[in-house]
Amino acid sequence: MWLKIQVFVLALALITLGIQAEPNSGPNNPLIQEEARACADVYKECWYPEKPCCKDRACQCTLGMTCKCKATLGDLFGRR
């Protein structure tokens, strides 16, 4: 009887883990797509040369080495 309860609890735990792991496991996951981009958008983290800023924007770094893509005047006024 005790063995049946242990097997049931183990099976229930494995099923629960499997259900929790499924939503983010697909190739169309937004987090995976964001990391796979070749360049960084405005105000996103950048690091040259691995992930430069898109559209020749400047990658501006602080003293703490946190680098973000700087907006251009066209970005500020809605031009693309």
From Swiss-Prot:
Q: Which domain of life is it from?
A: Eukaryota
Q: Where in the cell is it found?
A: Secreted
Any one GO MF annotation of this record: toxin activity
Give expression by tissue.
Expressed by the venom gland.
May I ask which residue range the UniProt record assigns to the signal sequence? 1-21
- Transmembrane stretches in the record are none
Instruction: Say if the entry is tagged with keyword Disulfide bond.
Output: yes
Task: Quote the cellular component terms of the Gene Ontology held in the record.
Answer: extracellular region
Keyword annotations from UniProtKB, A to Z: Calcium channel impairing toxin, Disulfide bond, Ion channel impairing toxin, Knottin, Neurotoxin, Secreted, Signal, Toxin, Voltage-gated calcium channel impairing toxin
Cystine bridges: 39-54, 46-59, 53-69, 61-67
Q: Propeptide positions, renumbered to this chain?
A: 22-37, 72-80
The entry sums up its family as follows: Belongs to the neurotoxin 02 (plectoxin) family. 01 (Tx3) subfamily.
**What this chain does, per the record?**
Antagonist of L-type calcium channels (Cav1/CACNA1).
User: What does the UniProt entry state concerning the protein's domains?
Assistant: The presence of a 'disulfide through disulfide knot' structurally defines this protein as a knottin.
> What is the recorded name of this protein?
U6-ctenitoxin-Pn1a
